[in-house]
Amino acid sequence: MDKLQRDGKEDTPRQRRFLYPLLFQEDLYAIAYDHYFNRSSSFEPMENSSSNDRFSFLTVKRLISRIRQQNGSIVPFVNCDQTQLVGHNRSFYSELVLGGLTAVPEVPFSIRSKHSLERMNEWTSFRSIHSIFPLMEDKIPHSNFILDIRIPHLTHPEILVRTFRRWIQDAPSLHSLRSVLHEHRNLIISSNLDQLILIASKENTRLSLFLWNYYAYECESLLVPLWKRFSYSRSLPYESFIERTPFYRKIEHIVIFYHKYLKKSLWFLKDPSIHYVKHRERSIIALRGTYLLAKKWRYHITNFWQCHFHLWPQPYRIYIDELSNNWFSFLGYLLSVKMKTSVVRIKMLDDSFITDLITKKFDPIAPTTLLIGSLAKEKFCDISGHPISRLAWTGLTDDDILDRFDQIWRNIFHYHSGSSKKDGLYRIKYILRLPCAKTLACKHKSAIRVVRERFGSELFTKSSPKERESIFLSFSKTRSQRERIWHSDIIQRNPLINSCRKKHN
């Protein structure tokens, strides 16, 4: 694969035209087999695997020879009868073929993405989810409106085939990809990435994720260059005539672009305060201006996607929120901009007067109601917050029970440490403390009062006092209760559900 990427980097047009012969390379299916085996071994023990799942390169050679003699696409192999596979599992070889079809377009796509990142040296990418919030904390208070964008639905496989056709000129590869997409429509037709992964896990998660990432990349590739040109454009210098100043001020805030897909010029009001962040299927655009300007941006984005993908993206999937009056939910936080008024005394020579200074402040809050709903979903409490004991954990030792509740609380507090208000987090801690006490009481067949007398009122936070002291004393002594901390090691969006699933409850 490295050699293919080096060859493609030297002669990209030639490499785009001859992708189909890669499907007849045995090494490609070896790569697909390794991926299939590694993914399967993590879910299924080796002794439980079927003998039909044993890979045979001799069978692959025979099937490749049979395909070459048919002068057809890969579909007869995918849909062939199980008896034609010399006694081997049909779904297993179908998985390998899908893996091969995934590896083929990944080669030019990875080269294209790498070149795009090399050209954008001023763009920085971080793995941590919390790296988004310092940017928003610095930039969003200077904005007036938020465009909350959901990526449009993919309703037909031909939309992806048309986008692939723009940069892959190998017709047999496109026909093979078209046949697979029509055969496995569940790989792409979904409006939610989590739902897409759940559906595709029964078929081929790698192919579905590649198609989703490619589709999201295409959605952004049309808009990001325009935003960059729009943000980095500079006004022409003009002479400062008093009577002509309003006229020149109007001219300098207008930028004209010609778009090759729309075949016409686009007029925008220039404003350098445009910021863009994206996570999974959601994108956030923060801009400074009027409500009319936000509606124009929504109109242009809708037209861009309609002309580029030949589909109708619903305008209601682009929400407009005014930061001064509303909050919006993003990455597990409720985000808003608060107006802070300060009384300032200004002294000028022999005179002084008092005035109000209004500043904008980024205000992220942990959603207590949503966190209680997540606890209720994992059976720690009901929807109103009343505790429920974990009967499945009563067979564990006391230390294991305390450690599990302690780890869940630490993950929640670690992720939402950027919240400006910690009261909701301490309420979550109180709710978790009661299920912990009830679980220990059920195990020892005693009352909750006896458990609290034995383990103390803090219960699970007593299991590691040093780390608890380092966390809470930092807030009580050296830092304010409203100070925010963003961590660079957080890569998961919902630490509660992930930590619960790791415990195999």
From Swiss-Prot:
PANTHER family: MATURASE K. This is Maturase K. Keywords: Chloroplast, mRNA processing, Plastid, RNA-binding, tRNA processing. GO terms for cellular component: chloroplast. It is found in: Plastid, Chloroplast. Its main location: plastid. Usually encoded in the trnK tRNA gene intron. Probably assists in splicing its own and other chloroplast group II introns. One of its GO terms (biological process) is mRNA processing. Belongs to the intron maturase 2 family. MatK subfamily. GO terms for molecular function: RNA binding. It holds the Pfam family MatK_N.
